[in-house]
Amino acid sequence: MTKKKAHKPGSATIALNKRARHEYFIEDEYEAGLALQGWEVKSLRAGKANIGDSYVILKDGEAFLFGANFTPMAVASTHYVCDPTRTRKLLLNQRELDTLYGRINREGYTVVALSLYWKNAWCKVKIGVAKGKKQHDKRTDLKDREWALDKARIMKHAGR
């Protein structure tokens, strides 16, 4: 029998895009790999990434992550110019790319980055096919969330 690997302390999540779930209805989620350079991997291991304004563009049969900011480390290579906001290629199956093309061509759909995390030794990004929320939808979600918290609080005190 093989031994299980010891779980490393800390979370595998590098960055979350909380604003995406607030501003969009997420209909489908996909997991994609990222084509990264060495300095970007070091920055991700240090947790210096921001995907708050990032989205996915589809061009020439490929998907690219646009708007993600990976802050370079201070001790990065001096002979290589680090571009923190460069467009990074997403690694998806052709079937997944075809599905995304079909969904994006419909009016009002976009693809946003939801989270950036480690899966084994690989950096993955969770992307979601999304449709924009109206202001009243955001208010309804906020009311539902507050009611769920109040309900949990009431149930906690009722058990005493």
Curated annotation (Swiss-Prot):
One of its GO terms (cellular component) is cytosol. Signal peptide: none annotated. It is found in: Cytoplasm. The keyword RNA-binding applies. GO terms for molecular function: RNA binding. InterPro entries: SmpB (IPR023620), SsrA-bd_prot (IPR000037), SsrA-bd_prot_CS (IPR020081). Keywords: Cytoplasm, RNA-binding. It comes from the Bacteria. Coiled coil: none annotated. One of its GO terms (biological process) is trans-translation. Pfam families: SmpB. The keyword RNA-binding applies. PANTHER family: SSRA-BINDING PROTEIN, TMRNA-BINDING COMPONENT OF TRANS-TRANSLATION TAGGING COMPLEX. HAMAP family: SmpB. Belongs to the SmpB family. Required for rescue of stalled ribosomes mediated by trans-translation. Binds to transfer-messenger RNA (tmRNA), required for stable association of tmRNA with ribosomes. tmRNA and SmpB together mimic tRNA shape, replacing the anticodon stem-loop with SmpB. tmRNA is encoded by the ssrA gene; the 2 termini fold to resemble tRNA(Ala) and it encodes a 'tag peptide', a short internal open reading frame. During trans-translation Ala-aminoacylated tmRNA acts like a tRNA, entering the A-site of stalled ribosomes, displacing the stalled mRNA. This is SsrA-binding protein.
